Structures are given as structure tokens and as C-alpha cells.
């Protein structure tokens, strides 16, 4: 079973009528075999749909139009089995609004040394057919991923899957709606941004709603629904008997369940995939949602604290991209440092860290929250599982958006944190904290990020290219002088590209 049950990519093979029916029959047969191989592979998370070989400008244009109008198609894989004159592709590529990947492969892995003849050579022409197609993509300045290698290899299938996941994320971005309750935290700069520019570039919509509208949805929740929700908590988390026997704590938990159910219904009714709130805008609320937000994120909803809609969008997009993979994705904040033999970052937030990243079964506890509405708030406590991860931040530079990515190694805390009443993750940024933090700051990265152990750097690279957005990567090879030069060069490139 594929992780993406409805979304699909189309597989389109290019050729031309010059070859005659016998060769074209072989081309179609080979293409179907590749598609079947991809669909039988556990490495590829999305259904690949075979489409008939295109042999003329009209056929190419028609399949591109069809892809545009098919809501389940998130992109197209293009392969030139034989030579397909690239001028035939101009109208179709101009029409195509979905992402495309250029698969530079060959049906047979090895040459039949003793039997090879010109018939074989003329049938298996990807080596120069794909170069012709590559030229027109470059000439037309089309962003695309190029995957090279034999289609049965693990490396090629992994790259295909990375791109499929990015295409699913891009599709989600085009259809995403984000609800904002309240505004940004007052005086904070990095969470601000141009929502119109974001919708033009990324596709997602951001809409503001009053706390009164949200409270109406919360107050519509019945006591029976709240009781059923408490039972779900008891089955999913570690909860002490003391909490259930304490009338006050149980009342706080019931209020939180009511918030969760009301918020979930509001988001469902409005077809929202992400939301933001702010501790400074809680009029009529019994407290800042803690457990409620954590559980909504665990169910796939994107979230950004203090009105951070850009991070809320990225959390949702990355959750979609990561379907079926081990690991989770969460809203996150760089909170405090552990300087030592290996410098580390302790990431957390006031309340809102997603349990999809938890190393073990979370504990549900009620603790005092002292920012905004000062009250006791139920929340899940855990530490993130050890392993590779990434932090991704999207910022608005005024004339463009920049995506910043830092590769991390999450580690198990050396000691328990008995007095820290929030979920957390301890990580070592690559290449080290000194370089990573300096590069992040030079790039203007936010204190909020979308943290993920399910998404790879390649997924974000592919997504950024689909969006036409600047992406800078901080990894094991980063050096500050080169990184600063990259930022300067990017400023020139993206400044010029806007006018070209």
C-alpha cells in the first residue's frame, strides 16, 4: 500500500513517429514495465500512472493540459526512450503548471555486447534523446529535477520518491488554507510577512478569525464528547491516577479537551490545514491551548506560535511530504544552549511541540503556564528521539522569501529534566553550533522552525525549486566565508531574476 493513497504522478515517455510502429510498440512496453516496477517498489510512496507515448506537439500539449486539470496528479515524470525532437515540447512545457522530473534512464542496464546492432542503438537512445530534451528545459528556464541512473537501482528510486514527496508538498501548498487566531506577537519582526506575496509564490491562503468565532465553536462541544475525549487521552498517554482524582486538574483537562474538539471542528469546517495563535490574544479563552495544539499537530495539522503563519504552513507541508516515513514533524524553537565538549541546542516551546517526534510514550501532566493567560494547562511531556533531523525556516526579506535549512543530529539528553514542564529536543547542529548558528543568523533565520526527522534535505531542495524560492543549506560542509558569499550572490541573482 502506497503512503499517498489518492495522489499520483504520471509517467510520460517521449518519442516520435519517425521510428515506426514496431519500435514504438517496444517503447510503450518498456515504459509500462518501468511503471510497474515503480509501483511494486516499497521505495516509492506514490502511485505512478502510465500514460501513452507522446510523439507529436499536439499529443505533448494534450497530456500537459490533462495533467494540469487532474486534481490527483501532483506532477509528471518525463523520459525520452528514443530521440524526441525538443521543439515538439515547447508548447506543452509552456502549458504545464505541475512540476516535472526528467528521468534520465535506460530500460536495459547493460549493453548486450555480443548482439548489439543498429536496431538496438536506435531503440535505446536515452543517452542523446534526454540531452535534446534537457536543452529545451534549460532554454526555457524550466526548474526540474534530473534523476540519472538505471531505474531499478535503490538510489534512483530513492530520488524519485524524494521528488514525489516534494510534489505532494507543493500540491498541498497550492491548496492549503491557514487560520490565524489573533495577530503576531507584538514587536516581533521575523514572524511578519507579506501574505499576498506568499499566496502568489507558494499558493497557500492565510485568513484571520476572531477569538469570538473560535469560542463559539468551542462552546458548542457537548459534555459527552468531552468525556469520550478524556477516555482517548487515558488510552494514548501516561497519566497519573493523581490527575484523575484531583478535581481541579481533571477540570483543567476537560477544558483542554473542549478546546481541542472545538478547534478541530473549526478547522475542519473551514478546510484549514494549519493555524496560528498568540498568547497575547486569548480573550474569552480558558488558556493557551497546549495538549490541544500538540494533538492537532499529531493529526497532521500545521502550527505556528505567536502568529507565525509561514512556519505553520511549512509544518503542514512537511507533514504531508513525510507521510508513511519513520519520524515526525513539529513546530520548534531554538530555546537555550548547552556549551561543552560538543555544543548543543535545547529546542522547545511554551507548550506546542508535536508528539510525533517523541522517543517514548508521552506523559500527560498539568502545569502552570505563566505567559498570557496565567493558568494551569495540560500538556504532553517527552523528549525527541535520537537521530538525524532538519530545521527549516521561511523568512520574508521584503523582495523575496528565503528558506533556510540546517541539518541536525538529535541526541538523547544525558540527564532527565524533572523540572522542565514542556516537551523538548536536544540536538547538535551540523557542522557545529558555532558555524551553524552564525550561518543561520547571517541568513536571517527565525527563532521558530519546522523540525523534522521524516523529511530529508533533498525533499526541501526539490520543494524550493518547485516554488522558485531561494534555499540556503547549513550542513557538515558549511564554511562561513563561503556561506556569506552565497548569500550575496543569491541577492544579486534573485534581484535580477525578478526582472527577467
UniProtKB/Swiss-Prot annotation:
Any one GO biological process: L-arabinose catabolic process to xylulose 5-phosphate
Domain of life: Bacteria
Note on how the cofactor is bound: Binds 1 Mn(2+) ion per subunit.
EC number: 5.3.1.4
InterPro entries with a match to the protein in the record: Ara_Isoase_C, AraA_central, AraA_N, AraA_N_sf, Fuc/Ara_isomerase_C, Fucose_isomerase_N/cen_sf, Lara_isomerase
Pathway membership, UniProt: Carbohydrate degradation; L-arabinose degradation via L-ribulose; D-xylulose 5-phosphate from L-arabinose (bacterial route): step 1/3
GO molecular function: L-arabinose isomerase activity; manganese ion binding
Cofactor(s) needed by this chain: Mn(2+)
One cellular component term from this protein's GO annotations in UniProt: cytosol
Keywords from the named record: Arabinose catabolism, Carbohydrate metabolism, Isomerase, Manganese, Metal-binding
Coiled coil ranges: none
Binding positions (Mn(2+)): 306, 333, 349, 448
Swiss-Prot/TrEMBL catalytic activity: beta-L-arabinopyranose = L-ribulose
Task of the protein: Catalyzes the conversion of L-arabinose to L-ribulose.
The family this protein is said to belong to: Belongs to the arabinose isomerase family.
Name recorded for this polypeptide: L-arabinose isomerase
Lineage: Bacteria, Pseudomonadati, Pseudomonadota, Gammaproteobacteria, Alteromonadales
Gene responsible for this protein: araA
Amino acid at each position: 500500500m502506497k503512503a499517498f493513497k489518492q495522489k499520483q504522478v504520471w509517467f510520460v515517455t517521449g518519442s516520435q513517429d519517425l521510428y515506426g510502429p514496431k519500435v514504438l510498440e517496444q517503447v510503450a512496453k518498456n515504459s509500462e514495465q518501468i511503471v510497474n516496477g515503480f509501483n511494486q517498489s516499497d521505495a516509492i510512496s506514490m502511485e505512478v500512472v502510465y500514460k501513452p507515448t507522446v510523439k507529436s506537439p499536439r499529443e505533448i500539449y494534450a497530456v500537459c493540459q490533462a495533467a494540469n486539470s487532474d486534481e490527483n496528479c501532483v506532477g509528471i515524470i518525463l523520459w525520452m526512450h528514443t530521440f524526441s525532437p525538443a521543439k515538439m515540447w515547447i508548447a506543452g512545457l509552456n502549458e504545464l503548471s505541475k512540476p516535472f522530473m526528467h528521468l534520465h534512464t535506460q530500460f536495459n542496464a547493460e549493453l548486450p555486447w555480443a548482439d548489439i546492432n543498429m536496431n538496438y542503438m536506435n531503440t535505446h537512445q536515452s543517452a542523446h534523446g534526454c540531452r535534446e530534451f534537457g536543452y529545451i528545459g534549460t532554454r526555457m528556464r524550466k526548474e526540474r529535477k534530473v534523476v540519472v541512473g538505471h531505474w531499478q537501482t535503490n538510489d534512483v528510486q530513492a530520488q524519485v520518491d524524494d521528488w514525489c514527496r516534494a510534489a505532494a508538498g507543493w500540491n498541498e501548498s497550492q491548496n492549503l488554507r491557514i487560520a490565524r487566531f489573533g495577530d503576531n506577537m507584538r514587536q516581533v519582526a521575523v514572524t511578519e510577512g507579506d501574505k499576498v506575496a506568499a499566496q502568489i509564490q507558494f499558493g497557500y491562503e492565510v485568513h484571520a478569525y476572531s477569538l469570538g468565532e473560535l469560542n463559539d465553536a468551542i462552546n458548542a462541544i457537548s459534555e459527552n464528547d468531552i468525556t469520550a475525549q478524556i477516555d482517548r487521552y487515558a488510552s494514548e498517554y501516561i497519566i497519573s491516577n493523581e490527575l484523575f482524582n484531583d478535581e481541579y486538574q481533571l477540570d483543567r483537562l476537560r477544558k483542554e479537551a473542549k478546546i481541542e474538539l472545538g478547534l478541530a471542528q473549526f478547522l475542519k469546517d473551514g478546510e484549514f490545514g494549519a493555524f496560528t495563535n498568540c498568547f497575547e490574544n486569548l480573550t474569552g479563552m480558558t488558556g493557551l491551548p497546549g495538549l490541544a495544539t500538540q494533538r492537532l499537530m499529531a493529526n497532521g495539522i500545521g502550527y505556528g506560535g505567536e502568529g507565525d503563519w509561514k512556519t505553520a504552513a511549512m509544518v503542514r507541508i512537511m507533514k504531508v511530504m513525510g507521510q508513511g516515513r519513520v519520524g515526525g514533524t513539529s513546530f520548534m524553537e531554538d530555546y537555550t544552549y548547552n556549551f561543552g565538549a560538543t555544543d548543543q541546542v535545547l529546542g522547545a516551546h511554551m507548550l506546542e511541540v508535536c508528539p510525533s517526534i517523541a522517543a517514548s510514550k508521552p506523559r500527560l501532566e498539568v502545569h502552570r503556564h505563566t505567559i498570557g493567560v496565567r493558568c494551569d494547562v495540560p500538556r504532553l511531556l517527552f523528549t525527541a528521539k535520537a537521530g538525524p533531523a532538519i530545521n527549516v525556516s521561511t523568512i520574508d526579506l521584503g523582495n523575496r522569501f528565503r528558506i533556510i535549512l540546517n541539518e541536525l543530529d538529535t541526541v538523547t539528553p544525558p540527564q532527565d529534566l524533572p523540572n522542565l514542564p514542556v516537551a523538548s529536543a536536544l540536538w547538535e547542529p551540523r557542522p557545529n553550533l558555532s558555524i551553524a548558528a552564525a550561518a543561520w543568523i547571517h541568513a536571517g533565520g527565525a527563532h521558530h522552525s519546522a523540525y523534522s526527522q521524516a523529511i530529508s534535505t533533498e525533499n526541501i531542495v526539490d520543494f524550493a525549486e518547485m516554488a522558485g524560492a531561494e534555499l540556503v543549506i547549513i550542513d557538515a560542509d558549511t564554511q562561513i566565508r563561503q556561506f556569506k558569499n552565497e548569500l550575496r550572490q543569491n541577492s544579486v541573482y534573485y534581484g535580477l531574476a525578478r526582472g527577467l
